[in-house]
Amino acid sequence: MQKTKFPFEILIHDDASTDGTQEIIREYEQKYPDIIKPIYQAENQYSKGIKINLTYNFPRAKGKYIAFCEGDDYWTAPDKLQKQVDFLESHLDYVMCSHRYRLYFQKEGRIDDEIRPIENLSDGKEFDLSFLIRGGWLFQTLSVVFRRTVIDLNELFKYTMQIDAVLYYVFLKKGKGYCMPDVMGVYRVHDAGVWSSLNLNHQRMFSLKARKAIYDVEKTDEAALFILSQFSRPMGRIQVIREYSMFVRITKILIAHFGAGFVLRMWIDRLLFNKKLCVNEFYQIEDFCRRKKIR
């Protein structure tokens, strides 16, 4: 349990689990009725396309801040919430705060450092929307605390997909984020996980679809750049063929923002050489969009 100087509530949505989870939740609900506030579903809602947090959790959240911890993951520091809330209380221009974490590979019983650690940054790192658009990623769901004021349900329901990338894009439109250097949680990797069960090609396709969902609402250069940062990564040719219609739609978006010549060259690099866009090229495109916006 977390040790904090402030009260908190734990909002749980049990999506018709059948593995004994409900019994465990009920046990803790009886012990801490003022803290544990569950919803028990008789039928799985996620499989029906229901956006769980938007429908069941965000509307009933009363706190000034919201933190995530999905059922597969866990926190390891008892002062995690206190540290993050203290930071946000003293830095009003930040809308979210994350921290470092470790990976638990359940099949092997192995715990490793995260895939993309912060190097030589003992004081942590600030990040913004531009960082996210360029492919930066300094958070897992279990590590994030954010201000409840950044939640606008009417805005979020416009997006057809409701995954991490969409939420963080919306949050970072409204302010900066900060990643603490402290390791305060563990992300579980296992075959039954929604994300970790996908192979690399499917993960990249899923991310690409999420970015298109953002563009369908935003229709800005920034949203197109967010597509580009994912689109430029190598992906299996078979996957491209299978998702042909999706790639056609994305190609039209990129041509509208960056020109047919550039997109054609990128397609040739992808299909013939399986190359991705280099960092300097991406920065040049980002700078072009910024100057176009200023004009």
Enumerate the predicted regions with their spans.
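Glycine-rich, basic loop-to-helix element that forms the pyrophosphate-binding segment
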Residues: Q41-A61, K83
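Conserved donor NDP-sugar-binding/catalytic core segment of glycosyltransferases
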Residues: D79-D113
